[in-house]
From Swiss-Prot:
The lineage of its organism: Archaea, Methanobacteriati, Thermoplasmatota, Thermoplasmata, Thermoplasmatales. The keyword Ribonucleoprotein applies. The keyword Ribonucleoprotein applies. SMART domains: Ribosomal_L31e. This is Large ribosomal subunit protein eL31. The gene is rpl31e. GO terms for cellular component: ribonucleoprotein complex; ribosome. One of its GO terms (molecular function) is structural constituent of ribosome.
Length: 89
């Protein structure tokens, strides 16, 4: 995906503490959806056009499904054709 031209590139701090309100067994899943929703609102793009890098997902899941980070910093790259990538900075 790195071959396309970049329209916009920003680093965003995403608060994930709202995921701790969900059940312990669903926290990591909820954190991924919170990340997708947050980037969707900030970049004004449809949720279906967002691609999350596996390293970002591993960072959320690294301490298990119940103990997620309360916030994380990600790099968001908006491409010309309308898709958005979420990667680690």
């Amino acid at each position: 995906m790195a071959d396309e031209t970049v329209a916009q590139e920003v680093i965003i701090n995403v608060p994930l503490r709202d995921a701790k309100a969900s059940s312990r067994k669903r926290r990591a899943d909820t954190a991924v959806s919170i990340l997708r929703n947050f980037v969707s609102k900030k970049m004004k793009i449809d949720k279906g056009k967002i691609w999350i890098d596996p390293k970002v997902s591993e960072k959320i899941w690294e301490r298990g499904r119940e103990h997620i980070p309360s916030k994380m910093s990600v790099k968001v790259i908006k491409l010309e054709e309308g898709t958005t990538e979420i990667i680690m900075p």
